[in-house]
Amino acid sequence: MVISMRSMDKSDEEKGKWVLLQAPGFNCATIGAVAMIIIHVVVMSTGGIFPDGAEGGLRSLYIQLGLTWEGVSSGHVWQLFTYFWLHGNWGHLVLNVILFYYSCARLSHVLSSSRILVLFLAVSIGSGLIHISAQAVFDGVPKDPLVGASGGIMGLLLAYFALSPGSRMLLIPVSANNLAKGILIASALLFVATPSLGLPFLSDMGGGLVDLLGPGLFQIAHLLHFAGGLIGWVSIPRFFPKLLTLEDLVRMRNQSEIVAELR
């Protein structure tokens, strides 16, 4: 079963066409979103992963399942598979669930659920490895445990942008290709501008952004977003089969009509 959503592709907008997204059902978009919600409800019902003054149980959950270089290098390799199922608060969860569902639903038109799942897991693990590698190399990278699926989701979103570079998202008047480049550039710049890294000029710029927008700006894992987005963006043409474009279909139809006429 599917539901109709307005297409953000310019040509489709002009023709008034509609694009189909998966409705809730037994598919990767729904299963992944529901799993994130259930896990968060269970965690929050017992106090959350950031309880004030917590000791033992909940804090241990955060330390054991959140991702850090110290944890993985100590043998807690499961953190690479668990960190992206936990979220810090409801706002964090809701945003990630919406983007996860949107990305999976769009990708489901050209990729199977199993391939979308493989892509999500590969991007989540790959971006997580890059994040903790930076923790090991740079003293200024926060050493707090990382939680959240945004790295993998960024990979899914930019994978969709790579498959449909001319499409447009609601309220964002640029092509998916340019939006993907903008996201990658912004994420990279925000990472290198992190004040705690102490990079000349860039850290000063980051300090100015903190004064303007608040310290929460650099509590976001910008390197994770950059790494996840880049992996998703470049992996589609390299590791997935070439997808048929509208031009390919038109050419195939014309060829079949010519063959039919010759007969």
What function would you assign to each model-found segment?
Residues 37-52:
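Alpha-helical transmembrane segments of multi-pass membrane proteins
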Residues 25-32, 90-97, 175, 179-182, ...:
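Alpha-helical transmembrane segments
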Residues 52-85, 204-212:
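Extracytosolic (periplasmic/ER-lumenal) interhelical loops and adjacent juxtamembrane/interface segments
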Residues 109-110, 162-176, 241-248:
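Alpha-helical transmembrane bundle and helix-membrane interface signal
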Residues 1-31, 35-37, 187-263:
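C-terminal transmembrane module of polytopic alpha-helical membrane proteins
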Residues 80-167, 195-227:
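Transmembrane helix-loop-helix
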Residues 120-123, 172-187:
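Central hydrophobic cores of alpha-helical transmembrane segments
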Residues 41-42, 129, 133, 234:
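Hydrophobic recognition helices of helix-based DNA-binding modules
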